[in-house]
Structures are given as structure tokens and as C-alpha cells.
């Protein structure tokens, strides 16, 4: 039997009256029940336990159609869509640094490369192609996140006594981080835009999954031993998506 995630495709965000809101489906081994997430720019994600039937997902979404539409409308009012524009300056709160960005076109080039000179980032190539520029900026953020976050994560690993096998840096659209059963910690490079205290909490959270691959009472007790203010930081982390610049296209 195909999974719900494979059977249900991503619907458009401009559904016809009477139809279900557009949504994507993500299967989670940790999920015990179906849940719906609405992101600031209107994207809707349904998180389901493994082996959930597609028709059950559709029924669940239909049940919550009014709530989804109200939530999306509320987000649209608070976070109106901004016109797309490539950045010329980027502020990364997590590492307390700002970077200037310049774009240098190269005739006949078919790609865009980046090179960093201190706090200046230079993109060269087919810079008239905004998509290629954004992809280059994402590669730069991923490389910088690995450079900055790996020593930080290893330091917290020693502090908490929780180990990990390797670090993976990605640009996930659905989560800030994860810890696999094989010991791989995945961290979202968008954390570079958040405050250091929130990033530190996320790292401690994922490291504590080395001993508790769930969100049980023991897990939260472990987190609390190393970050007493975890409840407030967890709420701040969950509310942080609007801090990510729109040109990244993350949500």
C-alpha cells in the first residue's frame, strides 16, 4: 500500500470554494496522531503517523478546513507577502555578524558561484537569474552554518554528555533540527538568523534525543537539566519562522 504522503499530492494554495485547502503530507515515525501545521506565509503541512491511509488524511483536513482558512487569513494579515528582492546585506543574529553582498555578472556564464572576503560576499556568474543567485546564497549559508555550528554542537555534546555521529546541515522547510536513530543530527541553516540562546536550546534539544528518541517526561527533564528556560525558548523557536527572509523561499 502506498503511503499517504505519496498518494496525496501538493495542492495549490488557491483552492476553489468548497475544496480542501492546499496542503502537503509528511510522515513521521514519532507522530502518534494526525496534526496540522500552518506556516506564516500560508503553507499547510499535515503530519501523520506511518501507514496512515490517504483517505483518513483527507477527512482530517476536511474536518479542520475552517480552522486552516482562519489561521491562514490571520497569518496573511500579520505577515503580508513581500515583493521578492535579492539581498544586498544579510544580518545573522546567531553569530552576531553582518555581510554585504555584491553581484557581478559574467558573460556566457550558466551558473552562479560565491566567494567570501571577510564580511563581503561576492556572487559571480549569471547573476541575472534570481533562482541561481538564491541557490548560491543557500550554499553559502549551509557552508557557514557548518563552520559555525559544528564546534558549538561538539562543545554542547561534551557539556551534556550526549554524543552524535555526524552533523548534517540542510534547509528544511518543516523543522529546525532532528536527530536520527543512526546518530545523525540535522540542523537547519536558517538558524543563523535566530538569536544565540534559541540556537543553543535547539542544539541541546537534539543532543538529548541521543538518549531519549521521544518527547517523554524523561526527555524534557534531560533538556531542563542543561537549559532550565527550555519552555520559553521552545515557544520562541516555534514562533521564529517569520524571522527568515522571504527570498530564501523556506515557507
What positions do the PLM features span?
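Walker B catalytic acidic pair
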Residues: 206
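Active-site-proximal or metal-binding-adjacent scaffold patches in catalytic folds
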Residues: 1-201, 210-251
Amino acid at each position: 500500500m502506498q503511503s499517504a504522503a505519496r498518494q496525496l499530492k501538493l495542492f495549490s494554495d488557491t483552492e476553489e470554494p468548497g475544496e480542501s485547502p492546499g496542503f502537503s503530507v509528511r510522515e513521521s515515525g514519532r507522530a502518534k496522531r494526525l496534526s496540522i501545521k500552518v506556516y506564516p506565509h500560508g503553507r499547510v503541512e499535515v503530519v501523520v503517523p506511518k501507514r496512515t491511509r490517504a483517505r483518513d488524511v483527507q477527512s482530517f483536513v476536511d474536518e479542520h478546513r475552517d480552522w486552516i482558512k482562519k489561521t491562514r487569513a490571520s497569518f496573511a494579515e500579520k505577515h503580508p507577502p513581500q515583493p521578492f528582492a535579492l539581498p544586498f546585506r544579510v544580518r545573522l543574529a546567531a553569530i552576531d555578524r553582518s555581510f554585504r553582498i555584491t553581484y557581478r555578472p559574467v558573460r556566457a556564464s550558466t551558473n552562479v558561484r560565491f566567494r567570501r572576503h571577510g564580511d563581503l560576499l561576492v556572487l559571480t556568474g549569471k547573476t541575472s537569474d534570481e533562482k541561481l543567485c538564491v541557490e548560491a546564497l543557500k550554499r553559502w549559508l549551509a557552508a557557514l552554518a557548518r563552520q559555525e555550528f559544528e564546534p558549538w554542537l561538539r562543545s554542547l555534546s561534551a557539556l551534556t554528555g550526549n554524543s552524535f555521529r555526524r552533523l548534517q546541515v540542510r534547509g528544511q522547510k518543516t523543522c529546525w533540527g532532528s536527530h536520527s536513530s543512526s546518530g545523525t543530527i540535522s540542523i537547519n541553516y536558517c538558524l543563523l538568523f535566530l538569536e544565540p540562546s534559541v540556537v543553543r536550546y535547539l542544539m541541546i534539544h537534539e543532543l538529548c534525543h541521543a538518549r531519549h528518541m521521544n518527547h517523554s517526561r524523561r526527555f524534557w527533564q534531560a533538556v531542563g537539566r542543561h537549559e532550565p528556560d527550555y519552555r520559553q525558548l521552545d515557544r520562541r523557536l516555534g514562533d521564529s519562522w517569520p524571522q527568515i527572509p522571504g527570498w530564501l523561499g523556506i515557507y
